[in-house]
């Protein structure tokens, strides 16, 4: 589940740059 967590974390981090 490391990959899933990594993607989720990246999504939150990127969300700060471009809020969906």
UniProtKB/Swiss-Prot annotation:
Pfam families, alphabetically? TCTP
Q: Which SUPFAM superfamilies match?
A: Mss4-like
Q: Which residues form the TCTP domain?
A: 1-20
- Reading the lineage from the top rank, the first entry is Eukaryota
Instruction: Describe the family membership recorded for this protein in Swiss-Prot or TrEMBL.
Output: Belongs to the TCTP family.
Any miscellaneous information on file? On the 2D-gel the determined pI of this unknown protein is: 5.1, its MW is: 20.9 kDa.
What is the name of this protein? Unknown protein NF040 from 2D-PAGE
């Amino acid at each position: 589940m490391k990959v899933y967590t990594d993607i989720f974390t990246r999504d939150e981090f990127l969300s700060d740059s471009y809020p969906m």
